[in-house]
């Protein structure tokens, strides 16, 4: 019964559905309602606002199978994954929840009934824990459920403070909290370990399978516990743990899901030992990585993207240990979809994107993995103690992209630790250098704290009167600004838009009779709007009334660019995939810049599709509608929110036909047709997993097209044709150039052969070895390698050193026939010469090249070759 994990999941959800619970889909691994949380790590995360009383649902009972990730931040299982039976980066949490509906009695009864009647677990294998003072829970277990008193274990404050207990749950220092009861399964006497509360409790015999939290108090800042008016229930049962019990195995890695992934990995890599811990690591990591990408996280160097990168790179390193010679990780996605069953709906929809992203990251890391591992191996082989220094760990991170936990993983296998404090110190030092390099003149107004509020009236008006409620110079409040002063003017209302959401602040003029204040920028300071600029005439005093006039032309051009970013965002998601999300933007009158998540360079044909799609929406002349609504209503309508932005309960939603709907507080055109034309000017990467598009609109786009046309016509003129024939003529010219280069190369080869024949005759004998040392003239640096090959063939057995002196530059090459590399290494020889001409170099024992910056010393350096060789050939 319920032998597969998929069947268990269905049975759990169906059991609670029959008992009046709403089956709610798993939320994203990226928490949408908690900026303090790196990843969704518990079933209750998506209901946090409900438990806090800040949100209401149309149901009071819910059940979920929630996808969770614990890697990075406070909840970090990464280091233990693969080495223990139950640590994972990704797991599914089965849960049932009551929002002021049932409480302890029903929660305990539901859990016991499901385990003992639905799953038919032997009651004698189960024991439970309760909080030490929770007599109510004890009585329910003992009197109503029938669990013997000796099988109900009271757990007190075992973590050094009041209510700090394994059996008392707290959301934070304040807020909802309460006691919990946990159900444990006894795997049998053949496994070491003791019951909860005993010295042997950390063993693997008794395993917690279900945690039932009773949220009945609201903890105040002073530590007092006030009863909640409507107590709630939050429960969680790890599906991997209960699957292990149902499938008669002890380790989670022995259940069906992991075994399928382990066997597939072994098949791809040709591994026969299925107990290899690296197989466990890979099988675990593909789950977290695939689902994170499916939920919109892309590998990068910060935040969630960096955690994903660390997990991928750890998996790739373990694949490398297993013998992987090419990208393999992404090939596990189809097997993952198969074994996850109904829980893989999001993965099915994004499979192609997930596979591409994982493959791209693996291939990128593979380019530095071997070299980085070589440096780490070398450092470890020279280690005298049992700790790797932080400097080396930082170099591996900084130069080769090795996350410190990956370095620690390699060290762990050799019983070596990493000086993490030293690593953090090196990291901090680099940050300090970067900050010092980036410091310019201080703008004291950046840190202004203004306790005032400005009403924004700039959606409908660009001109209006307002009262001065604040004046600031160099971050300090003043009573007045005189002519020539630079400062910040705060008004009680303004049509000026303060920079936010990527849109630049408005420019314009504040004026009164005899007074002019040129507004060069507008910034938000809390709820206040600061007009930054210069008093051109007169003076400004507190309480004075000014006319505020926005520069209409600049505002209009900015609006064109802002509106088109919405169209661009929607177009990118249509063409590239729904994993695309906005990561930043800059909207100015002259241009727009749009940063977005994507794992590879956007292809030329994809860029054209995006551009054409945006221009199609412009020509459709959609009316732009802006509405203020409840944030839940906006989400139901499908409005896109900017990742990382904090929104109020009431939000402004901007809609453009049926093509785009976003939360946005910025200013926009009336209709998409006002934009006129959209033209992409560049696309490129700015960080791993982050791409940037720059573009222009309206008159600027027309001017850009005109410039491109002028350049095309100029090229046509140079090629003696018209613009329609430029490509054909250019191709013909390139083909001709290629043929000429080929002929030139052949002539150079002939010349090198002739030169080598002449030079070979100049070789001298030294201790029975032919040696040729020559300062060449009239020979290009690119011909050196071929020339030394020819000379070695002519000499059959010998040593060649050639040098070329140019303008402030030296090129050197040394060649040693293979029969002599036991006595003389070309790399050592060329390095000796290069050191004398201000350079360095190296290479293989039979051929090595070098450069230098002091050509005047080359002749003397070459003279030192014979004495140097004499010592080694004697």
From Swiss-Prot:
GO terms for cellular component: cytosol. Its EC number is 6.1.1.7. The keyword Aminoacyl-tRNA synthetase applies. It is found in: Cytoplasm. Its cofactor is Zn(2+). It comes from the Bacteria. It catalyses: tRNA(Ala) + L-alanine + ATP = L-alanyl-tRNA(Ala) + AMP + diphosphate. It holds the Pfam family tRNA_SAD. Binds 1 zinc ion per subunit. InterPro entries: aa-tRNA-synth_II/BPL/LPL, Ala-tRNA-lgiase_IIc, Ala-tRNA-ligase_IIc_anticod-bd, Ala-tRNA-synth_IIc_core, Ala-tRNA-synth_IIc_N, Ala-tRNA_ligase, Ala_tRNA_ligase_euk/bac, DHHA1_dom. One of its GO terms (biological process) is negative regulation of DNA-templated transcription. Zn(2+) binds at residues 562, 566, 664, 668. SUPFAM superfamilies: Class II aaRS and biotin synthetases, Putative anticodon-binding domain of alanyl-tRNA synthetase (AlaRS), ThrRS/AlaRS common domain, Translation proteins. It is an enzyme of class 6 (ligase). Keywords: Aminoacyl-tRNA synthetase, ATP-binding, Cytoplasm, Ligase, Metal-binding, Nucleotide-binding, Protein biosynthesis, RNA-binding, tRNA-binding, Zinc. GO terms for molecular function: alanine-tRNA ligase activity; aminoacyl-tRNA deacylase activity; ATP binding; tRNA binding; zinc ion binding. Consists of three domains; the N-terminal catalytic domain, the editing domain and the C-terminal C-Ala domain. The editing domain removes incorrectly charged amino acids, while the C-Ala domain, along with tRNA(Ala), serves as a bridge to cooperatively bring together the editing and aminoacylation centers thus stimulating deacylation of misacylated tRNAs. Catalyzes the attachment of alanine to tRNA(Ala) in a two-step reaction: alanine is first activated by ATP to form Ala-AMP and then transferred to the acceptor end of tRNA(Ala). Also edits incorrectly charged Ser-tRNA(Ala) and Gly-tRNA(Ala) via its editing domain. Belongs to the class-II aminoacyl-tRNA synthetase family. This is Alanine--tRNA ligase. It comes from Shewanella loihica (strain ATCC BAA-1088 / PV-4).
